[in-house]
């Protein structure tokens, strides 16, 4: 495959012969709503240093052009940007229509490229520079509707409209992240300092990134070349008080006018024990290292680019979370706050996580005249996760969990974008995964050896119905095949009835254990439609989607102690695919003095795969809660809100809130790990004459989550009586 890919790339990048360069492109730029000319619009040729401004009559002229194919970029300060392909064989006259509206910085953005309009919420690199003390998931909460599921000082996952893990896709530099996202304690392997910008994709277009994005898609924007000889270097040093954390980040970028570009970004972050009001929390330090290198060559109608990144994190886990006997477990879970132990130190000991992630990709594109743009991409990822528990003797140096996941991905898509009022895009993608759990740990493997093959294809279309109305639609189908090798205890295999339902999976019977080779296949179909209305700063988008999600390996095969979670997790071979039906409405208003955004949603998920507390298990290593993957029907209902008032060009006030309710319909009970009602308020003052200087005063309040499942009533052999294990109880509301 790699030789075919290299051959295609070499064909894509073959240079064209020199031509006579005396042609012109002239025309007008018109306001799409009222037909009036737009003055000051930038008309440029993508990939070349040719750009002009439209005059007061909206007219422009580009001169000295060769015969050939060009992509014309038209933009205006108050409008979205368009990219229009043109085949130039003679002097050409064109009229371009721009949708004139006031955009609010870092709020709901209307992004238009080749008439591809999709509602997204965005944050740029400047926002992330102010969030360097936080991890990636925490920084994402600047986007309304994203909360976090936080299980440690440096361990947090994005939680979108009540769902997380495999239901929220993270697309990094055009690559879907494969970093064992199924674990609640598995944070995204992305350094906050490496992010150029992030957008949240919802609606029909989001199906391009995957058919299982029940919550949505978090898209990390790739670096864009500037097509001129330039270089830029930036250095950031940040420190923060809790944990005496420090972070250093360096970035260098180099661009050439011929479209070549390259860069390098590196960062290092270290913090010691955090503290609460009573004292230091032992073993809550962290250490992170990241480096990324983008490079490539972009022209107007063809290009190639590559990206390589490495991320490594050593995250301490609160020492108190290491459980001994049952009474220890009850005391720790029922306690209001963790008991501080020890003094401040940067040392990180067991229990801890040691995680690394490598990502590499190469992609190429070619724009065919009068047809569209074809893109090919290959990517590789390797994720290593080691989880260390407190063990005796030399075994303390060995991880209790040692997992490696390799992913090879290939994708191809074609975008038919020669028409102004419609767009069609289709593509295929495939991924092959090899999962290896190292048996040298001496501990039963939580997730077995498996190979996972995914194949997906999608079709997307957009139609401009009128200057104010647009319709999007997409369909997608995916096929998933998982082949595993796993040992089961004979007693458990029989108790679950697997000996009857899955007898063909048995390879060998070793009396007390059974070696099996499960082979499971799932075919999923997804569809989504989005209708957009936009006029005079008001925008309403309605999204209707049906999504099927195949179970992930953890939901199927988990069996054993998940060390970083300090619990036993059990999967089920009987898992069926989820079926989610979602209706979401987004309304936004943008004006010079204020912006407003509100988004109610309802998501009905049949056969929802939930990890539920189910009891306790006593082992030679102590007592641990048992959590089981179970299927039920679920309703997720919520609303996200954000309002910003601009008092002056430099002073603004922002208020936001998120509410989500989740109900287990079969058991008429709430789900665990659902975020409470949260609000935030921020007063921000920038200084026009001092570039880069701003002051923010922010407060966040999280209410107490009262809608939780019932706690477990267990028998305590030490006291010889039943005792309540408050495993689902939520903390009181708090203000930060």
Predicted regions and their residues:
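Outer-membrane beta-barrel signature, preferentially recognizing the C-terminal barrel domain
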Residues: 336-359, 502-534, 540, 546-605, ...
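Flexible loop and strand-edge segments within Gram-negative outer membrane beta-barrel domains
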Residues: 271, 277, 282-284, 302-362, ...
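Short, acidic, small-residue-rich periplasmic hinge/interaction motif at the N-terminus
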Residues: 30, 44-46, 75-79, 89-129, ...
């Amino acid at each position: 495959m790699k030789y075919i890919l290299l051959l295609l790339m070499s064909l894509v990048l073959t240079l064209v012969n020199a031509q006579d360069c005396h042609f012109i492109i002239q025309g007008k730029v018109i306001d799409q709503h009222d037909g009036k000319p737009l003055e000051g619009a930038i008309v440029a040729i993508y990939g070349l240093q040719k750009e002009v401004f439209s005059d007061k009559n909206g007219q422009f002229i580009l001169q000295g052009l060769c015969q050939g194919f060009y992509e014309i970029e038209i933009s205006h300060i108050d409008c979205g940007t368009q990219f229009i392909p043109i085949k130039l064989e003679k002097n050409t006259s064109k009229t371009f229509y721009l949708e004139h509206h006031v955009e609010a910085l870092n709020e709901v953005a209307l992004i238009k490229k080749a008439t591809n309009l999709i509602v997204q919420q965005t944050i740029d690199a400047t926002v992330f520079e102010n969030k360097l003390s936080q991890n990636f998931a925490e920084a994402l909460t600047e986007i309304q509707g994203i909360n976090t599921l936080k299980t440690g000082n440096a361990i947090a996952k994005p939680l979108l409209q009540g769902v997380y893990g495999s239901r929220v896709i993270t697309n990094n530099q055009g690559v879907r992240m494969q970093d064992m996202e199924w674990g609640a304690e598995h944070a995204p392997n992305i350094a906050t300092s490496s992010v150029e910008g992030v957008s949240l994709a919802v609606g029909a277009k989001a199906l391009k990134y995957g058919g299982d994005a029940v919550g949505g898609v978090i898209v990390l924007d790739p670096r864009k070349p500037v097509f001129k000889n330039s270089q830029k270097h930036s250095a950031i040093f940040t420190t923060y008080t809790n944990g005496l954390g420090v972070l250093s980040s360096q970035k260098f970028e180099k661009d050439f006018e011929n479209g070549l570009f390259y860069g390098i970004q590196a960062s290092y972050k270290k913090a010691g024990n955090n503290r609460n009001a009573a004292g230091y929390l032992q073993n809550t330090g962290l250490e992170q290292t990241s480096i990324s290198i983008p490079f490539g060559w972009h022209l107007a109608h063809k290009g190639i680019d590559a990206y390589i990144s490495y991320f490594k994190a050593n995250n301490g886990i609160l020492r108190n979370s290491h459980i001994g006997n049952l009474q220890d477990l009850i005391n720790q879970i029922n306690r209001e706050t963790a008991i501080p132990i020890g003094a401040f130190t940067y040392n990180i000991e067991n229990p801890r996580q040691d995680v690394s992630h490598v990502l590499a990709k190469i992609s190429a594109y070619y724009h065919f005249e009068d047809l569209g743009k074809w893109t090919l991409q290959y990517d590789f990822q390797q994720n290593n996760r080691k989880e260390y528990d407190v063990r005796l003797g030399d075994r303390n140096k060995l991880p209790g969990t040692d997992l490696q996941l390799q992913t090879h991905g290939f994708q191809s898509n074609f975008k038919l974008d020669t028409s102004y009022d419609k767009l069609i895009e289709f593509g295929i993608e495939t991924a092959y995964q090899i999962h290896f759990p190292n048996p040298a740990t001496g501990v039963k493997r939580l997730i077995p050896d498996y190979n996972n093959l995914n194949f997906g294809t999608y079709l997307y279309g957009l139609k401009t119905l009128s200057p104010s109305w647009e319709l999007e639609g997409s369909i997608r189908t995916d096929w998933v095949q998982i082949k595993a090798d796993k040992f089961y205890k004979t007693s458990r295999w029989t108790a679950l009835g697997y000996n009857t339902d899955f007898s063909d999976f048995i390879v060998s019977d070793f009396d007390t254990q059974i070696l099996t080779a499960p082979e499971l296949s799932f075919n999923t179909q997804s569809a989504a439609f989005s209708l957009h209305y936009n006029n005079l700063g008001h925008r309403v988008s309605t999204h209707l989607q049906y999504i099927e999600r195949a179970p992930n390996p953890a939901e199927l095969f988990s069996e054993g102690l998940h060390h970083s979670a300090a619990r036993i997790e059990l999967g089920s071979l009987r898992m069926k695919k989820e079926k989610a039906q979602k209706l979401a409405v987004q309304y936004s208003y943008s004006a010079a003095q204020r912006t407003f955004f509100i988004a109610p949603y309802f998501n009905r998920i049949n056969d929802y795969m939930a990890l539920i507390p189910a009891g306790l298990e006593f082992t030679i290593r102590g007592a641990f809660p048992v959590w089981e993957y179970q299927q039920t029907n679920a309703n997720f209902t919520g609303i996200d809100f954000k309002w910003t008032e601009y008092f002056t060009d430099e002073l603004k006030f922002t208020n936001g809130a998120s509410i989500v309710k989740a109900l287990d319909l079969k058991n008429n009970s709430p789900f665990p790990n659902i975020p409470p009602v949260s609000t935030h308020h921020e007063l921000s003052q920038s200084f026009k004459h001092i570039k880069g200087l701003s002051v923010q005063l922010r407060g966040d309040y999280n209410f107490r989550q009262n809608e939780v499942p019932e706690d477990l009533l267990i028998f305590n052999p030490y006291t010889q009586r039943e005792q309540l294990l408050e495993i689902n109880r939520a903390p009181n509301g708090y203000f930060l």
